[in-house]
């Protein structure tokens, strides 16, 4: 359910684009992202960092898109957000006792430190590549292809990557249990 909630602004953007075009879709995504943050706050009395970061950039770049009537601003939003995630993930190797992925999942999964480090770096690399891939699609294909890639392409890549991470975690969690006997 959280997955759908997280993807709701993208889904609304996609639907609005298909019916009314990039500018209405941009405005819709701006409104829905703000609603998403508000609903999350009302429900949990806290903010989800991912939602807030996305909201900031969709409001900023969405406003530029609407004011200047140029879709390039909204097309850059995913790349900027992905690269911020990559920088934060990579930077967590140098700040604090544990990497960001370790801090996020340590209550749920027990893994060796080396495995946590590799997971964190793989997520950082994944977001870096996803940002580059978004720019490749932006500058080499039309807006319709970019919108389809934004929903279906990134979703498929994310699911495949998460599945690969799950297998990697399962293998190393199994090794950890075997080695501790």
Curated annotation (Swiss-Prot):
Where is this gene product found? Cell inner membrane
Q: Which terms are listed as keywords in the entry?
A: Cell inner membrane, Cell membrane, Membrane, Transmembrane, Transmembrane helix
Q: Which domain of life is it from?
A: Bacteria
To which protein family does this belong?
A: Belongs to the YciB family.
Source organism (scientific name): Coxiella burnetii (strain Dugway 5J108-111)
Q: Does the keyword Zinc apply?
A: no
Q: What is its main location?
A: membrane
Indicate the transmembrane segments per the record.
8-28, 53-73, 76-96, 121-141, 149-169
InterPro entries reported in the protein's UniProt record:
YciB
Q: What does this protein do?
A: Plays a role in cell envelope biogenesis, maintenance of cell envelope integrity and membrane homeostasis.
Specify the protein name: Inner membrane-spanning protein YciB
One Gene Ontology cellular component annotation held by this UniProt entry? plasma membrane
Membrane topology reported for the UniProt record: Multi-pass membrane protein
Q: Methyltransferase as a keyword?
A: no
An example of a Pfam family matching this protein is: IspA
- Give the gene name: yciB
């Amino acid at each position: 359910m959280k997955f759908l909630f997280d993807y709701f602004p993208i889904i609304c953007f996609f639907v609005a684009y298909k019916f009314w075009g990039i500018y209405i879709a941009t405005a819709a995504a701006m409104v829905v992202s703000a609603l998403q943050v508000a609903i999350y706050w009302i429900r949990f009395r806290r903010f989800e960092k991912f939602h807030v970061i996305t909201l900031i950039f969709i409001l900023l770049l969405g406003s530029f898109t609407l004011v200047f009537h140029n879709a390039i601003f909204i097309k850059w939003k995913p790349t900027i957000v992905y690269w911020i995630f990559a920088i934060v993930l990579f930077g967590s190797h140098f700040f604090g006792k544990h990497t960001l992925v370790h801090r996020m999942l340590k209550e749920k999964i027990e893994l060796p430190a080396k495995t946590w480090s590799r997971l964190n770096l793989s997520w950082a690399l994944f977001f870096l590549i996803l940002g580059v891939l978004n720019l490749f699609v932006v500058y080499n294909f039309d807006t319709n292809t970019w919108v389809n890639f934004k929903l279906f392409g990134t979703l498929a890549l994310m699911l495949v990557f998460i599945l690969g991470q799950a297998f990697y975690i399962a293998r190393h969690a199994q090794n950890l249990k075997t080695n501790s006997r």
